[in-house]
Amino acid sequence: MSFVTVKGLNIHYEKSGRKGKKVLLLHGWGQNTEMMAYIADFLKKHFIVYNLDFPGFGESEEPKEAWSNEDYVDFLHEFVEINKINNPILIGHSFGCRVALYYAYKYPVYKMALTGAAGIIAPHDLEWYLKVYTYKAGKILLKPFKNLSKKLQSNAGSEDYKNASPVLKGTLVKCVNFDITPYLKDIKPETLLIYGDKDEATPIWMGKKMEELMPNATLITFEGDDHFAYIHQPDRFNRVLEAYLKSDYD
């Protein structure tokens, strides 16, 4: 467990691997490093992996005021500079993809793999976003993640949105009202988009639109799965990553 000060906040992250290109794992809303830990374990043989808690989540300090999507991008850039990372590979889920996409618009990125990517505005209210972006009742995860599911239940789900701090509620309002669509045509890194075709939080039409507008994006679907397909099918997800990143192995 490591901590570093970024934008004046105490930030938790886990670093693994000793050689290779550098990968940043960016979790979804209401989640933390644990959600991406199995990906880090898989990739650390060939990459240097940074798995971080966004400000306001996990073990990282909460911002003093509501942040926008751009604030999170600025945070990520400062983290990258502190750790002397050049042209990172970004792997994200949901909210993490929202940050990754705008980061790739503003700063150099080598490649991205984005699952359940958020960023295109959908006609929903705040309460809906808070419900679908966090785990409800712990019934989403399959057996390999039962222990993780219990941990998440204590901090997420139907009660979490009611008890979320004013800062995080304000943050979510700002972030979900930021539309990445006008920037997609200028996001040039090779990007793999992975969506469950039953995703209700970020419906597959969003992935199709991103694939259409981004010059180097490819969309694949996990049939019959939802917004958390990467957790429901971890082995399949890692095999997809392996095929996508194998040419970059150290």
Regions picked out by a protein language model, each given a short descriptive name:
Residues E14, N51-I91, R239:
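Active-site loop/oxyanion-hole signature of alpha/beta-hydrolase fold enzymes
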Residues I187, L193-Y195, D199:
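Short beta-strand/loop motif that positions the catalytic acidic residue
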Residues R98-K143:
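Flexible "cap/lid" loop of the alpha/beta hydrolase fold
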Residues D125-P189:
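Conserved alpha/beta-hydrolase catalytic His-Asp/Glu region
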Residues L9, E14-E59:
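Conserved HGGG/HGGXW glycine-rich cap/lid loop of the alpha/beta-hydrolase fold
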Residues D225-P234, N238:
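Catalytic histidine-centered segment of alpha/beta-hydrolase-like enzymes
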Residues P189, P203-M210:
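Short alpha-helix in the alpha/beta-hydrolase fold that links the catalytic acid
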Residues M1-V23, K44-F47, I85-N86, Y110, ...:
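Alpha/beta-hydrolase fold catalytic core
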